[in-house]
Amino acid sequence: EGTGLKIFNANAATLLRSMEMGCAGYSGVMANFHPDLYVWLCKNYKEQPEKAQELMNFLGAASMVECQVYPVNSKYHMNLVGVPMTLQSRRQDYKLLTGSKKLEIEEFCAITETFRKSFFGK
């Protein structure tokens, strides 16, 4: 306190709890998958705590996709949502994103959209 220093959490599963304890926001890789959900949480968790917890339940479970073949899976996801890019990465061999892992990302994309519609009422 008393400085301009702000702490941002990069762990999606602990985000809500850390913001309740004073963290300034989120700066994690899962924002590559659904940034709008993190924006909503950071802006609204104080005024709508029950809804924030509902969202956090989804985000915490969704964060497990990070353990798959990140960042290749994120690049694949970006292609699915209309942002074209190669799957090549310095960190992971894109060949590790097998057909079944691609299917998991496709299903993850679909369930995220289902959650988004339910959560925002669209």
Give the role of each language-model region.
Residues 1-70:
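Catalytic alpha/beta core domains of metabolic enzymes, predominantly
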Residues 69-122:
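C-terminal extensions of enzymes
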